[in-house]
């Protein structure tokens, strides 16, 4: 309480893009909130962009009272199958059906958003659940939700890959969005003589002013011709 900085936006889609940008810039979890119904329906454009960019984002939205959900009874902003809409544009979407489920669902959503391939996860919270009072979980005092540990890989395969890289005369890195979280490793390979090209979402893994990068121009005819001169490419 009183430790969350709330930044307002002019619309729900803008809020989603702001959360996406925060996740990319801070290399952490972004979050935005929308109202139910039309408010939630304004979010999918931003959710699709975050999903395309593999940005870990939590989208919290409302829902009509649990007794009225999915019945088309004319409750305010009761959109039929709102959860289905969010599932189609998010990595996953969940509904908190009871107050005691809230922390567990939110933790699951955060972990899923942070699990590669990262992406946005939506969570519906019905209005009566929002208003309910529960005992504050003690685990909140020391709660840390970290990305899951990466796969260490097969040692023999990694050794073979290292041998190939060491013997290469013209090695190249092709970095996508996931490489944003491995900037130090990318820089080390660049310092060893690797050239770099990135996808649009992999931009800024290293500064595009660096003499060893071709930036995000990975599909131009000139660069594709250049690939033919490369004897080792790590993607």
What role is predicted for each listed range?
Residues 1-235:
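N-terminal alpha/beta PP-like core and its mobile active-site loop of ThDP/TPP-dependent enzymes
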């Amino acid at each position: 309480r009183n430790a969350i900085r709330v930044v307002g936006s002019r619309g729900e889609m803008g809020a989603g893009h702001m959360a996406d940008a925060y996740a990319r810039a801070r290399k952490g979890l972004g979050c935005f909130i929308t109202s139910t119904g039309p408010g939630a329906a304004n979010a999918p454009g931003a959710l699709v962009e975050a999903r395309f960019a593999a940005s870990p984002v939590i989208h919290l939205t409302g829902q009509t009272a649990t007794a009225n959900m999915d019945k088309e009874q004319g409750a305010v902003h009761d959109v039929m199958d709102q959860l289905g809409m969010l599932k189609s544009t998010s990595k996953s979407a969940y509904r908190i059906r009871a107050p005691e489920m809230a922390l567990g669902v939110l933790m699951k959503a955060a972990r899923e958003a942070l699990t590669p391939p990262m992406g946005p996860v939506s969570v519906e919270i019905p209005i009566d659940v929002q208003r309910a009072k529960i005992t504050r979980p003690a685990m909140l005092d020391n709660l840390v939700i970290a990305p899951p540990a990466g796969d260490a890989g097969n040692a023999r395969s990694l050794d073979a890959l290292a041998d190939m890289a060491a013997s290469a005369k013209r090695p190249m890195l092709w970095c996508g969005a996931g490489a944003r979280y491995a900037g130090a490793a990318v820089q080390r390979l660049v310092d060893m003589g690797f050239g770099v090209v990135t996808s649009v979402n992999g931009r800024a893994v290293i500064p595009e002013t660096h003499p060893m990068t071709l930036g995000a121009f990975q599909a131009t005819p000139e660069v594709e011709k250049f690939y033919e001169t490369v004897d080792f490419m790590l993607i």
